[in-house]
Amino acid sequence: MEKRIVCLAGDGVGPEVMESAKEVLHMVERLYGHHFHLQDEYFGGSAIDLNGQPLPQRTLAACLASDAVLLGAVGGPRWDSAKERPEKGLLALRKGLGVFANVRPVTVESATAHLSPLKKADEIDFVVVRELTGGIYFSYPKERTDEVATDTLTYHRHEIERIVSYAFQLASKRKKKVTSIDKANVLESSKLWRTVTEEVALRYPDVELEHILVDAAAMELIRNPGRFDVIVTENLFGDILSDEASVLAGSLGMLPSASHAEKGPSLYEPIHGSAPDIAGKNKANPIAMMRSVAMMLGQSFGLTREGCAIEEAISAVLKLGKCTADIGGTETTTSFTKAVMQEMEEQALVGRGR
């Protein structure tokens, strides 16, 4: 297989974890006979430094022409007083790609379950599906004076149906349960959300549907996260709840994410930030970035075997006690990456020898 991947290393630890992603992709090429054209483009703060814009037209054009986009990290205090903020580029990139579904799998490795703030953390295995293009972040009017400020929360039927349908399709391949999170006891937009969700559910009779109000959901994520399979919710609620859920893994450096469009390339990125305090020190945890690569291989390219090989190698290395500093170890970004690559190679040799 031959695919073109645009690599947006971005800021902070982004270039370091992106290098890990590239090395893993090169290992996949060697072991499985694929070829990936990796195209580097400027994005975020590094792009602002170059030409004053966080998302240059050249970068967006390259992304649109690609088969998938990998993003390292964006932002940092260096650009806090800049006219253009790096994070603005991320919103523009999502809009330019037309991605509407943000997918965050939340799992806990048995080898690192002790780092989770919860007991029985190794029972956690769910996915948060967040609507990305509607809701209060993108609705108008937005107004502010010295005395009053106004934001508008709007959702259209087709936006709700699109994201909920995606969640049901995903659940049908997992444990067949969808939890829809809203505030239908108060918000008109949530009442429409619940109505449309129930209509979509009729098309998936083998998938269980439950509704939970967002405040109760925030509590249940901590009290009983094992009850969830696929969570689907609107933009603001998803923004908050997915960050809450990410803490369950014990480190932000463990979890990947994907953002999908109806057509065109998807965007894959770790959920952690740019971590400027450790940038350039070879301390960043590359697991979330490598898992983002695994998601890309499976979800965009249909290379499930190759994606699983990366995941299995990561788990095997962790079970050997090899961990980066954020999860209680002494491995560097490069040494952990090399350990995963070696494990991938060894597992491939064992598989071929059977």
Curated annotation (Swiss-Prot):
Binding positions for NAD(+) per the UniProt entry: 76-87, 273-285
Q: Where is this site: Important for catalysis?
A: Y137, K183
Among the record's GO biological process terms, what is one? L-leucine biosynthetic process
Instruction: Give Gene Ontology CC terms.
Output: cytosol
- Keywords, sorted A to Z: Amino-acid biosynthesis, Branched-chain amino acid biosynthesis, Cytoplasm, Leucine biosynthesis, Magnesium, Manganese, Metal-binding, NAD, Oxidoreductase
Species of origin: Bacillus cereus (strain ATCC 10987 / NRS 248)
Localization: Cytoplasm
Name the family the entry cites: Belongs to the isocitrate and isopropylmalate dehydrogenases family. LeuB type 1 subfamily.
> Has the keyword Zinc-finger been applied to this entry?
no
Protein name per Swiss-Prot or TrEMBL: 3-isopropylmalate dehydrogenase
GO molecular function per UniProt: 3-isopropylmalate dehydrogenase activity; magnesium ion binding; NAD binding
Main localisation, per the record? cytoplasm
Pfam families registered for this protein in UniProt: Iso_dh
- InterPro entries (UniProt xref): IsoCit/isopropylmalate_DH_CS, IsoPropMal-DH-like_dom, Isopropylmalate_DH
The answer to whether the entry has keyword Signal is no
What does it catalyze?
Answer: (2R,3S)-3-isopropylmalate + NAD(+) = 4-methyl-2-oxopentanoate + CO2 + NADH
Q: What is its EC number?
A: 1.1.1.85
What the protein does comes down to: Catalyzes the oxidation of 3-carboxy-2-hydroxy-4-methylpentanoate (3-isopropylmalate) to 3-carboxy-4-methyl-2-oxopentanoate. The product decarboxylates to 4-methyl-2 oxopentanoate.
Q: What class of enzyme is it?
A: oxidoreductase
The Swiss-Prot or TrEMBL record lists the needed cofactor(s) as:
Mg(2+); Mn(2+)
Entry cofactor note text? Binds 1 Mg(2+) or Mn(2+) ion per subunit.
State where substrate binds: R94, R104, R130, D215
Question: Which pathway does the record list?
Answer: Amino-acid biosynthesis; L-leucine biosynthesis; L-leucine from 3-methyl-2-oxobutanoate: step 3/4
Cite the HAMAP family for this sequence.
Answer: LeuB_type1 (MF_01033)
Q: How does it assemble?
A: Homodimer.
